[in-house]
């Protein structure tokens, strides 16, 4: 994209097609903290794509990297007494779980379909489990594992959505029903957002490939209209009579871009970041570019708090960030404690294993020395 071209032209074309504005009922009450997540896809110069996301929570979700092999039999457990949808994974998947469950909150399959679960508190409206058959029902936290395990493209996922319902049930480790929505991207660059609304799964094509949290995706797209003046180019000096007013330093074209950690602000900022970033070849160059962008959305402990106190519990922070190279099938992760990016490739794993595999993420608390010991 040319430097002189405002990065908002993409979003404006989308809005011109008629993106509807969804107004949320005023009586809607948020019962959980609005945990932050930010996701995006970067195109490369050679037709590849890299997906990146952060995972924020106010309490430890005990995530581990796992590999779910081909033919692994999975069941979405609706309650202790009720089994939901059962399926056998068609494709192997690598990703991050939570609470030691064999379920993915983020991941990529061997065909390059990648995506994640992002928090959507106060807006998710799931299907009532009493109104649908259990054998067609998925919990909110099992939907991504089902999608990545069974499909290779976002078109296939869209076609299969009518066969399942995502039902509102309590997640035992959390103690409440987590409100979430989903982002999915395939190796061709196609992207969709799936949101549970009015008991149904609403699908949006995602021309920008970005997603954060509440409110709904179409609201975020409409909100971009407030920022159509932003561009990566510095503004020209302003001449007033005999005076020339120069911008104060670099970045004047982005003056006014929101810098806080709220979902609407992060949506605007990550859109600006990916659409103005210069494309590079796929592989490690694109991965490093994605890492630089992710660093701009890293939330340290203490920046986001529900109340003024010295207790870490409830302070939203970036527990981990992931990058999926969808062309080369490499999945990377770095954690709050371990900032070195670690990668796993499908070719290094037994994709036909009988059990799902937990992959240990090395921990290096100290910085690595510049001069290596002989």
Can you annotate each of these PLM segments?
Residues 36-135, 168, 373-374:
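A contiguous strand-loop segment
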Residues 13-25:
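Sec-dependent N-terminal signal peptides
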Residues 154, 158-196:
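Aromatic- and glycine-enriched pocket-lining scaffold segments that form the walls
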Residues 30-36:
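Sec/Tat signal peptide C-region and signal peptidase I cleavage site
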Residues 110-111, 148-156, 283-287, 326-328:
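A short, structured loop/turn motif at beta-sheet edges
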Residues 128-164:
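Compact, glycine/acidic-enriched structural inserts
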Residues 1-14:
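N-terminal secretory signal peptides that target proteins for export/translocation
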Residues 36-50, 58, 169-170, 177-178, ...:
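C-terminus-biased signal that marks the final domain/tail of proteins
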